């Protein structure tokens, strides 16, 4: 994951994804992470996952796609640190992007609500 200022890479981070890391998130519970253009829509300093910043998934297109399948698109996708009581499980991120706590401090401090985020493989 790259943190950019305009076209300049400020930092690079390794991250973890859910149990189905390939392909765009389609419906709630599919274990995938959204792909595409979104924005940061909230910040949570009291997250169960150290600190977290919310991604604006689902957008209108995501909702329409899931509705066409008769399902919910899911939601509450975040970039976050590790849980306060961390146990490595097969899908502890639930479709979110997880980074180390120290890295999450940097990201949290540098990213504002409204910041665009581009999620691509």
Predicted regions and their residues:
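Short acidic-glycine loop/turn motifs at beta-strand connectors
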Residues: 4-9
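Exported/periplasmic cell-wall-interacting domains
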Residues: 37-38, 42-121
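Gly/Thr-rich phosphate-binding beta-strand-loop-beta motif of the actin/hexokinase/Hsp70
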Residues: 1
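Electropositive
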Residues: 10-39
